[in-house]
UniProtKB/Swiss-Prot annotation:
Keyword annotations of the record: Cytolysis, Dermonecrotic toxin, Disulfide bond, Glycoprotein, Hemolysis, Lipid degradation, Lipid metabolism, Lyase, Magnesium, Metal-binding, Secreted, Toxin
Annotated organism of origin: Loxosceles arizonica
Glycosylated residue positions: N251
Cofactor details (free text): Binds 1 Mg(2+) ion per subunit.
Expression sites by tissue: Expressed by the venom gland.
Designated name of the protein: Dermonecrotic toxin LarSicTox-alphaIB2bii
Subcellular location: Secreted
Lineage of source species: Eukaryota, Metazoa, Ecdysozoa, Arthropoda, Chelicerata
MF terms (GO), sorted A to Z: lyase activity; metal ion binding; phosphoric diester hydrolase activity; toxin activity
Top-rank EC class of the record's enzyme: lyase
Disulfide bonds: C43-C49, C45-C188
Domain of life: Eukaryota
Length: 274
């Protein structure tokens, strides 16, 4: 999963390095409109934090990259995580943010349901109090006549809240599936300081008979040793600034029989247990 892909040209760059998924930051204006694909300072070490596009222009480029037959099409690119930088919004704006996000995706990415981009989408929300963003997104697609597109959409609460608190937020939002759970820390902090305890709890929830999690991914992993540690606990995805590092580890004898990069034929909402 290629991290912080916010300029159009970076789509090609990260896929060519081996990524089958990208993560893109989405900032909002004061009226809860998605405005830019932009991270800003601070960000991961050894990355330029200020690359950006207008959100709708990025969606159009992403659509071309994920539409079979287009000259810019990448068959390998099957999943996009939108990291929704909604920290500037009030809690009571979350529904509107979801509504406006859905309308933008419907028009500029899904092409109003007419041969739009085919990638699966994960809406990654940092604040549990913004669970109504999910509600606004779902209800808008239904109102606009395209409820079937929700089959392409999953969810992630990306804060470091307890697993139980996250489960409660999903309950409030009426979410019963298609859940990706993230865990991690910036690459500027040594991974051993943070540790894998919360990621292990997420994997345990995924593997339990009554868990809410379908997939677990870990970020931001740039080192070979940390990649192996994450794979050893059974995560489903790894977010990285260096997709070639992940690809190289997956080709090692200890991992190539158990793991592979997902393709479009794989179901990103299906649970695989340890």
């Amino acid at each position: 999963m290629g991290h912080m892909v916010n300029a159009n040209y970076q789509i090609d760059e990260f896929v060519n390095l081996g990524a089958n998924s990208i993560e893109t930051d989405v900032s909002f204006d004061s009226s809860a409109n998605p405005e830019y694909t932009y991270h800003g300072v601070p960000c991961d070490c050894r990355r330029w934090c200020k690359k950006w596009e207008y959100f709708n222009n990025f969606l159009k480029a992403l659509r071309k990259a994920t539409t079979p037959g287009d000259s810019k099409y990448h068959e390998k690119l099957v999943l996009v995580v939108f990291d929704l930088k909604a920290g500037s919004l009030y809690d009571n704006q979350a529904y509107d943010a979801g509504k406006k996000l859905a309308k933008n995706l419907l028009q500029h990415y899904w092409n109003n349901g007419n041969n739009g981009g085919r990638a699966y989408i994960v809406l990654s929300i940092p604040n549990l109090a913004h669970y109504k963003l999910i509600t606004g997104f779902k209800e808008t697609l239904k109102t606009e006549g395209h409820p079937e597109l929700m089959e392409k959409v999953g969810y992630d609460f990306s804060g470091n809240d307890s697993i139980d608190q996250v489960a409660n937020a999903y309950k409030k939002a009426g979410v019963t599936g298609r859940v990706w759970q993230s865990d991690g820390i910036t690459n500027c902090v040594a991974s051993f300081i943070r540790g894998l305890d919360r990621a292990k709890k997420a994997v345990k929830n995924r593997d339990s008979s009554n868990g809410y999690i379908n997939k677990v991914y870990y970020w931001t992993v740039d080192k070979y040793a940390t990649t192996r540690e994450a794979l050893d606990i059974g995560v489903d995805g790894i977010m990285t600034n260096y997709p070639d590092v992940i690809a190289n580890v997956l080709n090692e004898s200890a991992y190539k029989e158990k793991f592979r990069l997902a393709t479009y034929d794989d179901n990103p909402w299906e649970t695989f247990k340890n």
